[in-house]
Amino acid sequence: MSFRTRLLFFGIAWLIVLMPFLFWWSTWFGRQLSDAKLNEYLHDVNKPRHIQHALVQLSDRMSRNDPVAKKYYPEMVTLASNPSVEIRNTDAWAMGQDTTVPEFHQALLKMLQDPALMVRGNAALALVRFGDASGRPQIVSLLQSANVLAPATGKLTDTAKPGTAVREGGLIAKVQTGSQTLEARSPLTGRVALVNMPRGAEVAAGAQLAVVDPGESQVWEALRALYVIGTPDDLPAVARYEREQPDLPDRIRQQAILTEHAIRQRMENK
C-alpha cells in the first residue's frame, strides 16, 4: 500500500470514528459562538465547560478551514496539560482536526501518557488521523473493563448497584476512614458490571471495589479505529464484542466482526 493510499485510508477511517463523537458533542455544545464569544469562552478559566464549548466550536471551524481557528492553535497545545480532565479530553479531539500542525502531533503523543484513561484514548484516536498508530495500546484499552479501587483503608459505606449506568467521573463507592469520607469514581463512561464488596465491609487501600464495562460510544470508536490499525495481538479484545451483549446494540457485534476480518486480511496481505 503506497504512502498516499495509506493516508487516504486513515482519513476515511478518521471520519468514520469522528462523526458520532461530533454529533454527541453538538448536543451539549451546539450553540454557535461569535468570534468574540469564542475568545471569551476559551479564556474563561473559572468555567471549564466554557473552554470545552470553545474547543468544540474551534474543532468545527477547523474542519471548515476557518482561518480564525488558526490563531488559537498555540493555546490548544497549552490546554493539553490543563488540570481539567474534561478540557484535556475535548482538546485531544480538537487537535485531531488539523493534521498539518506538528505541534498538535507532538502534544497528542505526550497525551498518550495522561493519567486519565479517556484522555489517553481520545489522544490515540486523534493520532489515527495523523497516520500514527502509536496509540494502538490505548485504543485497545478502551475495549477493556476498568477496575475501581478503594482510595484508602476503611469502611465501605456506599456502593453503586450492578447494572447502573455511569458517566466518567461518576460516583461508584464511598469509603469512611477515620473522620473522612473518600469517594471512588469511575474512570470511564459505561455500566457497573460487578460490585466486589457489600456495604459495611472493611476494605484495604487499593482493593478492587467494582468493575465498570465501557459504554457503547467508546467501544464503537475503538473498534472502528482498530479496523484500520489493529494487529493480531488485538484480536482477543475484539472477539469479546463479537458475542451478543444485552447492554450493547447489534451494530457493536457487527463492527467487531468487521474489525477482526480487516485485521486478518492485513495479516494475509503481508
Range-by-range predicted roles:
Residues 58-65, 95, 99-100, 127, ...:
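Alpha-solenoid repeat junctions
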Residues 157-166, 195-206:
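Acidic, glycine-anchored pre-beta loop/turn
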Residues 54-55, 91-92, 109, 123-124, ...:
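Hydrophobic core positions within HEAT/HEAT-like alpha-solenoid repeats
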Residues 2-3, 28-42, 64-81, 89, ...:
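Amphipathic alpha-helical scaffolding segments comprising HEAT/armadillo-like alpha-solenoid repeats
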